Amino acid sequence: MAAPGLRLGAGRLFEMPAVLERLSRYNSTSQAFAEVLRLPKQQLRKLLYPLQEVERFLAPYGRQDLHLRIFDPSPEDIARADNIFTATERNRIDYVSSAVRIDHAPDLPRPEVCFIGRSNVGKSSLIKALFSLAPEVEVRVSKKPGHTKKMNFFKVGKHFTVVDMPGYGFRAPEDFVDMVETYLKERRNLKRTFLLVDSVVGIQKTDNIAIEMCEEFALPYVIVLTKIDKSSKGHLLKQVLQIQKFVNMKTQGCFPQLFPVSAVTFSGIHLLRCFIASVTGSLD
């Protein structure tokens, strides 16, 4: 299911040298993105398109069941998305409030995206990485699983709201199911749910519960593979193949393309920012 403004390029792989050349010619207003463009090409490729390494392994086999480049943003859109995530006087990025029940949630007119996942999957770390261009925004990160106990709302200018949901599984809040299920079912301005899966261990039983919830409510959602810095290329390839097969055969509402990311190396963060900006209509 494609949201307004989502650019789809079915089956077309990036011509990486051409893309990098276009990126180098693009003048972004984001100083951080300008610094990214000065990286060596191989490092830049890994940072912006982490699935490129997987593509190289799969190309000889002609795997048509994989959807590695459906979301096909232009270099200009990647830079524009970075600008949207950059805090300025005109583009305020702030923590809004927290809530334990949907009727306590702030009534915000903007499009909304939420992040859910198992305890200790790296959810808060990922959100902190997304907001790295707005360093004044405080996203609390803890090494202890189950640190997030409430729904935390962050506004990104006048564009959209990001919601950090409590983790499920170990040390989850007692009212987790009621809290999250009610939010997913009743939040009318929710545009996309981002389901985080640990790339080291893959989809777990508790993840299946969250997936079933999204499917039951007919919600558009996407799987984000976290902690790819802790996975070898071979292990990441194995997880991508297994999860892609699961998405193709077992889901209806899941976006076909996976998004591997690392909150440590920032690999995949720029592309994920662009996807968020796209599904919320912020690039229109």
Swiss-Prot record:
Originating gene: GTPBP8
Binding site for Mg(2+): S124, T148
GO CC term, one of those recorded: mitochondrion
Alphabetical list of NCBIfam families matching this protein: GTPase_YsxC (TIGR03598)
Record-listed GTP binding positions: 117-124, 146-150, 164-167, 226-229, 261-263
Keywords, ordered alphabetically: GTP-binding, Magnesium, Metal-binding, Nucleotide-binding
HAMAP family per record: GTPase_EngB
Domain EngB-type G, residue spans: 109-282
Entry-linked InterPro entries: EngB_GTPase, G_ENGB_dom, GTP-bd, GTP-bd_ribosome_bio_YsxC, P-loop_NTPase
Pfam families registered for this protein in UniProt: MMR_HSR1 (PF01926)
Lineage: Eukaryota, Metazoa, Chordata, Craniata, Vertebrata
Molecular function per GO: GTP binding; metal ion binding
Official protein name in the record: GTP-binding protein 8
